[in-house]
């Protein structure tokens, strides 16, 4: 096992926290060695943040742009780090971004791969032994609430997978060349969100066996035969994708903070 180290021991890097690790493929990483034998340390959050987010525009990747006084990534990490039922937070970063890690004590950091699925696999490998469940979350959803996290964890008590979603309420069209070509029945259709939660062993095996490109981790899970429960989603839990999304996310966060 690689010796624990904090980011402030690395040149040109910021400190994560006294139990933080920089993890790389082939090494085990733990927040605190004593936690490995603690049966209550059972839920981990895996934040996928290795992408470049070009559709959002800007000079830096979207996770590093500031909203409501902090980078997007800081809001997302704090939502999970502050939750009483989350034992570990694993952050998957692009190698070029390691020097930008926020100062959050106990954060476990690993580098990502070429595709999102590669980054998730590397993040799963960095989760400490003994962890029972993992909540996989897009870094670009900084408005996730305690209640959503709680609901996913509660659903995993009886299900192998659980994810938040909102039913589609708008009319749906098909189209080509700027022309409406048909309509789509919206019954039974949902807008998927994250965090998507799973039993750790099951989703790790599912990712190892999956071949191809998946839209999200629910697709990977279902391909492995995992049943995924639908939990109520939240309209405020938007994913920052386009430039206009930054202003909306900032409004949501400032409203919660009483601004």
Where are these regions (language model features)?
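N-terminal glycine-rich phosphate-binding loop and ensuing alpha1 helix
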Residues: 40-96
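Residue-level signal for inorganic ion chemistry
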Residues: 47, 73, 123, 137-138, ...
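Conserved core of the sugar-phosphate nucleotidyltransferase
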Residues: 83, 143-231, 259
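Acidic helix N-cap motif at the loop->helix transition within catalytic regions
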Residues: 97-102
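Short phosphate-binding loop-to-helix
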Residues: 103-133
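Hydrophobic helical membrane-anchoring modules
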Residues: 237-259
């Amino acid at each position: 096992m690689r010796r624990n180290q904090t980011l402030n021991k690395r040149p040109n890097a910021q400190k994560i926290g006294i139990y933080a690790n920089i993890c790389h493929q082939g090494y085990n990483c733990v927040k605190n060695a004593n936690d490995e034998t603690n049966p209550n340390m059972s839920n981990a959050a895996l934040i996928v943040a290795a992408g470049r987010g070009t559709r959002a525009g800007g000079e830096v990747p979207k996770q590093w742009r500031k909203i409501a006084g902090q980078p997007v990534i800081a809001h997302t990490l704090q939502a999970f780090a502050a939750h009483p039922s989350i034992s570990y937070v694993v952050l998957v970063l692009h190698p070029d971004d390691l020097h930008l890690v926020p100062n959050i004590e106990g954060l476990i950091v690993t580098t990502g791969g070429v595709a999102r699925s590669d980054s998730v696999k590397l993040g799963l490998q960095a989760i400490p032994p003994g962890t029972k469940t993992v909540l996989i979350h897009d870094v670009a959803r900084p408005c996730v609430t305690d209640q959503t996290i709680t609901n996913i964890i509660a659903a995993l008590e009886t299900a192998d997978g659980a994810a938040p979603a909102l039913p589609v309420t708008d009319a749906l069209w098909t189209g080509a060349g700027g022309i409406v070509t048909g309509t789509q029945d919206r019954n039974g259709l949902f807008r998927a969100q994250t965090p998507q939660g799973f039993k750790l062993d099951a989703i790790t095996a599912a990712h190892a066996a999956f071949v191809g490109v998946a839209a999200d981790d629910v697709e990977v899970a279902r391909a492995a035969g995992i049943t995924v429960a639908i939990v109520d989603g939240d309209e405020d839990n938007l994913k920052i994708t386009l430039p206009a999304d930054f202003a909306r996310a900032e409004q949501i966060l400032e409203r919660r903070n009483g601004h």
